[in-house]
Amino acid sequence: MGKILFEIGAEEIPARFIPLAISQIEENFKKITSEYRIELESIKVYATPRRLTLLAELSSEQASEEKLVWGPPVHVAFDEKGLPKESAYAFAKAQGIEVDQLQIKPKGKGNYVCAVLSKKGKKTEEVLPEILRNLFYSLNFPKMMRWGEGTLRFIRPVRWFLALYDDRFISFEIEGIKTENKTQGHRFLSENPLNIDRVDNYEFILEKAFVIVDPEKRKKIILTQAEELAKKVNGKILWNNELIEEVTYLVEFPNSVLCSFSMQYLKLPEELLITVMKDHQRYFAIIDNEGKLKNYFVVVSNTKAENEENIKKGAERVIKARFEDARFYYEEDLKKGLVNLLEATKGIIYHKKLGSLYDKSLRIIRIAERLSDRLIPEKTELVKIAANYCKADLASGVVGEFPELQGIMGGYYAKNAGMPEEVFLAIREHYLPKGFTDEIPSNDIGCIISLADKLDHIATFFYLGEIPSGTEDPFGLRRAANGIISILLKKKYSLSLLETVSMIQEFVDEKLKEQISIFIVQRFESYLESTGYDVNLIKTISDFILIRPVYEIKKRLEAVSLFRSKEDFEEFFLAVKRVSNIIKNYEKFELNPELFSSEEEKKLFNEIEKYKENLYEYLNSQQFFEALNYLHKLTPTINNFFDNVLVMDKDEKIKRNRLALLQHLSELLKSVADISRLY
């Protein structure tokens, strides 16, 4: 095994693209080495803003390649005595082997002569330039650029390539840039360039040059430094995984600095301050033990500790200016008030074919009112108030500057206007949930507004023909559908998907409602698959998925899944499957008990009627597992019927009546789920 080091040196790579680069380098290098028949023992990929580095252990040479070359049929190549003919000699010569090295193998309907050729692999060092070029060209990013007069495209201008194998320099070039055995240290803190004579020295040499090349090491340094600084002011860091990752890829040599801001800014909404620090400045906010924001924050710099005072002053000056801007917008919004903000939404176009934001609010009110009358009629007036103002903050200065605070600021403005807690919380939370794992709104009013908003969002874009296809979903319709399902599941509302979609009245006809229903069902099925239910299991409840409450569908699935694991499940399944197979190609027939001519028919009919009556109690209380166990008891009666009754009687009336009896039985057996679809 030999160690390889390949470094791509570039201008500052945007932090958001570095995780993509790391995954591509690892996956593509594995694929390329496999194609070159080189064994890959281990691989690590490091990254900083200025470099992407591959470290790997490879076999010293390619594996030999065997190739099978087909020749003529045996009877053409050899005579009856097995002696080679001219064609055998010609084929062997063409392949560079002796006749006695030819083999005979079956192919199609006969035996053919063939040659098995072995090609010895090259030394890894010989093919590495080609491999590394292919690796570089395989990297692809959403935004690529060209620079200078060359044709090379990359995420940022490439400045150098470093390539070593077994501590030997590998010389080649990519688009005129030659590889070296040199790298660059920190842009401002080190003397460049740096000679790398051994692969194992790479990290050590860079660390001395103020570059921590391993992102995991940088992350640990950031976490440790920041927590220690927060402890100095009796606080703790308000961690955010996305921010940690981003900051890790913004610096090569992390140095965390404790900063502060005036207490007066704590009068502003915490979310506003945190958004300014986190999203706009990439600073870490500090909270106390109760989770309240403190007037301190941590900035992670890309320089040495001796520059801390300058960093601190600069960060505090910037955050003060940002907070002043935020305060100005917030106070101006409060002066305008929620009523005026709502009025301003009349002038904001939601979509040229859908009207203004105010028009959207009116649609949300109407959908929310229908939902509320169905689910929480005693709170319909509060629902209408919340729905009326839920989009008002989109006309505010704060949300204009910080769009991620939509809803949250609306909640603050509603609270300031003296609205009930249920209402301002509903406005604040109505964008929730954004996915299956997110929290849903904390009260029913918020859930109703969220459902109404998401239903309108899906309906209007379906009306415009903007239906998601493939992986594309530019308007977040799948996310909206996921949110609807999540609320219906977690709140256990007695709403089916069909009834939920029926709450939409504007912009949709029955055909479009059907399309929307199918779309949401598909999202529900995807969710169920993601939670571990297999496709066949989900098929068993497909007859109910539109017409029964969402949470009930999940309970039915849980029951079938548990029931399937029983030891005696198989005998019931076979009985159900037999019934299903016999009736599946027939139209619906009318049942006439007077045509029964055997005791088995009468017994089965009487059992069905008895079970229908008793099963209702299980279904009504949603005891679906118990219902399946109860139906299981019918198995002997079903088997007895098939053992003694010929369904396909010569008399057409008798035959149809027996099929009608089995159709009647099938309806009963499918009361919980259609078990016949399992296999």
Swiss-Prot record:
Transmembrane segment boundaries: none
The protein, known as: Glycine--tRNA ligase beta subunit
Example GO biological process: glycyl-tRNA aminoacylation
Main location group: cytoplasm
GO molecular function, one term: ATP binding
Cellular component terms (Gene Ontology): cytosol
Subunit structure, as described in the record: Tetramer of two alpha and two beta subunits.
E.C. number(s) listed in UniProt: 6.1.1.14
Gene assigned in the entry: glyS
InterPro entries assigned: DALR_anticod-bd, Gly-tRNA-synth_bsu, Gly-tRNA-synth_heterodimer, tRNAsynth_Ia_anticodon-bd
Annotated catalysed reactions: tRNA(Gly) + glycine + ATP = glycyl-tRNA(Gly) + AMP + diphosphate
Organism: Thermodesulfovibrio yellowstonii (strain ATCC 51303 / DSM 11347 / YP87)
The entry's keywords: Aminoacyl-tRNA synthetase, ATP-binding, Cytoplasm, Ligase, Nucleotide-binding, Protein biosynthesis
Subcellular localization, as worded in the UniProt entry: Cytoplasm
Signal peptide per UniProt: none
One Pfam match: DALR_1
Similarity comment text for this entry: Belongs to the class-II aminoacyl-tRNA synthetase family.
Family matches, as PANTHER family: GLYCINE--TRNA LIGASE, CHLOROPLASTIC_MITOCHONDRIAL 2, GLYCYL-TRNA SYNTHETASE
Catalytic class of the enzyme: ligase
